[in-house]
Amino acid sequence: MLELARRGLADLGAAFKLRDIWWALASEDIADSHRRTMLGPIWPLLNYLLFVGTLVLVLGRGESPNFVAYVSTGMLVWLFISDVLTMSANLFSREEGFIKGTVLPISIYVMRQTLVISIRSFYALLGAVAILLYSGFAVTPALLSVLPAVFVLLLAAPAVAVLFGIAGAFFRDFQFIVVNATRLLMFITPIFWTDPGAGGLLGFLYYWNPLTHYIDIIRMPIVDGTIPTNSWTVALSVTALLLASALIALGKFNRRIVFQL
């Protein structure tokens, strides 16, 4: 396993040496996705604002004292996570032309996708900041933990991309499973519902859904001014497991992916 992890690290290192390539490819993806549109990259911002606005109007003030901030931050993180899950499932199939026509490291396509999703999320972030400034939130020392929390989320994203991308390359139905599972996950992840504070199904889903903890390490410092240590423990543990698994999988399958496309 150590040898496989070493190969995975070598592929990742080669991709970072060619970071100008995946930066250029990601920039092209963003430009192409809004080509000949009037609003261009403002669309991700509008989509986010419409989504959050609809939830707040339909659900009212909810059970949280600052429900608007609760939903807006939860939805921001969720949109990033859902993009990572759904786009990763057909990542290498989508990059078939490049993979078959070049000898670039496989990790380049992973980093390209991660950068594209991050740029799109940045536009949504502008909307989240505007909502938070309008609805109000307390400035506390806990806010300092938001940046490292975002870093943890960004570390997990390429690891998921590797694992899901490989699974999707070998099992083409995987992408459809992931799309449908992600739709379900939106409702069993506390994006717009709060901690029930008791047992039952909601309590089980809240505490045992790892996505809860990725959301809470970013959301709780903003909404409650607290640092959720339990969520940090879960998020760091899951991220470490994802990274280790991704490196091993990358080392084992990086040269075999091309033959599955």
Predicted segment positions?
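Hydrophobic transmembrane alpha-helices and immediately adjacent juxtamembrane helices
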Residues: M1-L261
